[in-house]
Each structure stands twice: as structure tokens, then as C-alpha cells.
Amino acid sequence: MTTAAAVISPWPLVRQGDQYHPVKTLQYLLRARGHNVTVDGIFGPATNAAVRAFQQQKGLAVDGIVGPNTWSALIITVKQGSQGDAVRGVQEEFQFRNLSGGPGLAVDGIFGPKTDAAVRGFQQALHQDIPSVAIDGIVGPVTWRALVSGMLAL
């Protein structure tokens, strides 16, 4: 059986000068990791400095470019009951992409029943093409990557 990670779209490359998506998700994840950045969707000097600081903390190449290694280190697994900026990042993805549950899903940082239903619906849609995707309501590495890379988008 092919693993989900082998067939899911690659992580996007995000760098200074990029705007809106997936910069807002990046900024929410940086905040969840303790970096003081404004979530404005603009990858400016403050976001660049936070990315470089994060890369240095994690022993990654310090280049200010958010690619596969930085995304993988940055994501935080969230599930029903989770709260905070990582959850806001998930909710932002659903709203931006107008995915199932997205239009009515508040970006409030609370992983409640509506967010859980949206995540499970997304995982179900992925599962149809990639049977190894679990439909468990947990946003771990595979679900994060599918969301951020734009699978099933718009």
C-alpha cells in the first residue's frame, strides 16, 4: 500500500515577500511556537526574523525559507479539545480554501465539534484517493501537509 505521505502534494515554499496564504497559517504556527508575530498574511521582516529564529532553535538551515523541513518541525498535532494558535491555523486553512465546514467555521482557536467535523470530512475526501489516510479527526503531519499544500482546494 502506498503511504499517504508519498502521494500528498509537497509542502509549499514560503519566503519573505509572499502574502496571504499560507503565510497566515505560518504566522499562527510561529505564534503557537512562542514567536511574537502579527497574523496579517504578510511575510515581512518580522515574520522572516521569527522563521530564522525558529530554524536556528530547531537546528535547521537558517535561510528564512519555509520549506519541507521547516514546515515539518513547525506543525503541531491538534485534535478535538485542543486550543490556541495551531488550531487557528487549521481553521484558517478551512476558511481560505472554502472546504467543507469552512465558511461557517470560526477562527477562534477552539477545536470543537465543528472543527472536528470539518477535519473528518476533509480526511474522508482524502481517504477516497489515498486509502492510507486515517479518518480520525486528528490534524497530524499528513493532514497538515494536505491542508497547507492545497489538496482538495477551492
List where the protein language model places each region:
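Cell-envelope/ECM-targeting effectors and their regulatory/trafficking segments
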Residues: 1-154
